[in-house]
Amino acid sequence: MNENNISIIIPAAGVGRRMKSYGPKPLIKVGNSTIIKNQINLLRTYVANSNIVLVCGFKAERLMNETPEFILKVENELYDQTNVVRSIGMGLRASANCLGVMIVYGDLVFNSEAIKHISFQKSSVVIAERGMGDEEVGCIIGTDNNLTHLMYDLAPKWGQIAFFTGLELQLLKNLCWDEKNNTKFGFEIINNIIDKGGSFNCIQNDKIQIIDIDSSKDIQRAREILL
């Protein structure tokens, strides 16, 4: 698949209750740059010709103003009444003609290993054996290295990065464009896709590092990834 036919959706509308005073989490500085700029730099390196769609919500104007002009920005004005699925759905509307969609949550700090092994020929999820907190969603992986189910209280963790194409992309659109799913989490939609016959390869190796920034302690841990 040509990279020109790939869209990267970065859902970044949520408040982040424990870090609200920091403003939009993608603008938190980690190392010499912000979370979102670190993400974009890596994504532009490894998926150079893709289209990037940033979905804003909490303090949307500030986030839009402090991110590069070459990315597309849309606003989930109902961010405080809905969940990430509505933001993903809005990103999909802006990516209508793409053959593949990568989703990267907007509060992640990760290294190049987290994205450079993604194949654009098959839907997949990135597994994080290091970095993600115990409270994050874990994975049940089948003997064929395909994802069976996502649920809490399991290891290894889903790294909140996924790629969708073919049947899985069509199911993602159908589910995210259904209003009754607006309050769902992303992992619930992935489970729904699997239940409807979709399949996700699991990308995992011990060099992948991903941290979901949920506290000030996570910021210090994230700096070590970028060293």
Predicted segments with their positions:
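Conserved alpha/beta core of the MobA/IspD/sugar-nucleotide pyrophosphorylase nucleotidyltransferase superfamily
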Residues: N2-I6, K157-L227
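Short beta-strand/turn micro-motifs composed of small residues
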Residues: A12, G31, C56, Y105, ...
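Conserved core of the sugar-phosphate nucleotidyltransferase
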Residues: N111-E188
